[in-house]
């Protein structure tokens, strides 16, 4: 374990001082011994304290650590960020630029991870898609740059495409939710990602496509590889009960933009599946006839594809990573080959990764949700009725890991809806659900929790394991319409090599690489670190 005086960075007990002394303390994730951080944490903590003392012009800054809020950084704040970076990098003798020699600091992935969620995103693995030096400085800058106009436009276009594919669910329980306690609201929010994933799977099997599809994987820091089905269950890391930093493993997650069947036959409508309780296999056999293609969507203000070599290479590796993550969750081994494994093993793999992801996000996966929260989820998301029925009436859910876990739990985990008045929900439940919900108002065989619903989500992955295509696509959009498509053959060996290189950077085993000199005029003008970047000013000085 780290010494008491140097525990501050990993524990992230952050005191935020803005607007005349506003202070907030955050609970800390556990630490599983990070000896490589011991010499550097005091320096880094001093840097954090200095940075968080600078004033802000925006009086609506949320009561959260500055480094994780997305408010616009004015020039004065940018100067403060850069000034403190100079101090952190011990650059006084190099002024006005950052030191040429990389200081001994916590590795970039630790510095960049959110305090309550010790994990990284897929995009953080794309360290040099723009400039790796910028990625490096961003990790330690303790504040994110304000999104550009292009980024805001891209977010809006992605949201529009998502809503076009997946009809936004209507909240029919607003009046009921007005009486929710803060705990009940937190429970409902913690289920959002899980409910979206279920919805995406059902839409994939009913309309042949899904957008914003959650994926997750675990990186072995020693081998620089992703963990596959053959090694996953051996890791103590996946059996933790709370967020932690780990010497050996890093959790990575992201959202795949678009998953689409290349040969789709109009199958069952989502509503009919709800009414008739069709099985997942029925949906698959009815609608999905061809391979499922992983697609990444890039949005543009004008119908022009970038010519930047680094950006294009980054796009190709990004779509490869999404394909890799989804393949691993569906039973492929790290070489990208379908392993001779059983449906149960695929269930267990997906279940383990999803539970670990929820834990690293700080969620209590075993906390039974309030019964009223469960019914609100059903009213707003009627397509989960089949899953709720299984949790209610079945002794076994068909996932050996979950069934074994539940058998070892005490009766404190029971869940009872018999005390809830069903009439309170009759006005907001769809007619097709009214009769089926009657059996839910009793004592359930299993509690409704993130863990139990995840055990049922894992059943979707064997359905797609043999249907993932080796072809991937990048689709470029402007104003909601695709104007160009690039096709790439999935190359798992190349992705493994890419992963090895990027993980070395993220864990501090190699220094960042600057961009090509020829790219400096095009890229450095958009970087908030240009004024203190020695490399940029050496070849293109700021005047």
Swiss-Prot record:
Family recorded in the similarity comment: Belongs to the EXO5 family.
MF (Gene Ontology): 4 iron, 4 sulfur cluster binding; DNA binding; metal ion binding; single-stranded DNA 5'-3' DNA exonuclease activity
Binding residue positions for [4Fe-4S] cluster: 131, 524, 527, 533
The name this protein goes by in its record: Exonuclease V, mitochondrial
The EC number(s) this enzyme carries: 3.1.-.-
Cell compartment(s), UniProt: Mitochondrion
BP GO terms, sorted: interstrand cross-link repair
A single GO cellular-component term on record: nucleus
Keywords: 4Fe-4S, DNA-binding, Exonuclease, Hydrolase, Iron, Iron-sulfur, Magnesium, Metal-binding, Mitochondrion, Nuclease, Transit peptide
Quaternary context: Monomer.
Originating gene: EXO5
Coarse class of the protein's main subcellular location: mitochondrion
UniProt function note: Single strand DNA specific 5'exonuclease involved in mitochondrial DNA replication and recombination. Releases dinucleotides as main products of catalysis. Has the capacity to slide across 5'double-stranded DNA or 5'RNA sequences and resumes cutting two nucleotides downstream of the double-stranded-to-single-stranded junction or RNA-to-DNA junction, respectively.
Transit peptide per record: 1-26
Requisite cofactors: Mg(2+); [4Fe-4S] cluster
Record has Nuclease as a keyword: yes
Cofactor mode of binding and number, as noted: Binds 1 [4Fe-4S] cluster.
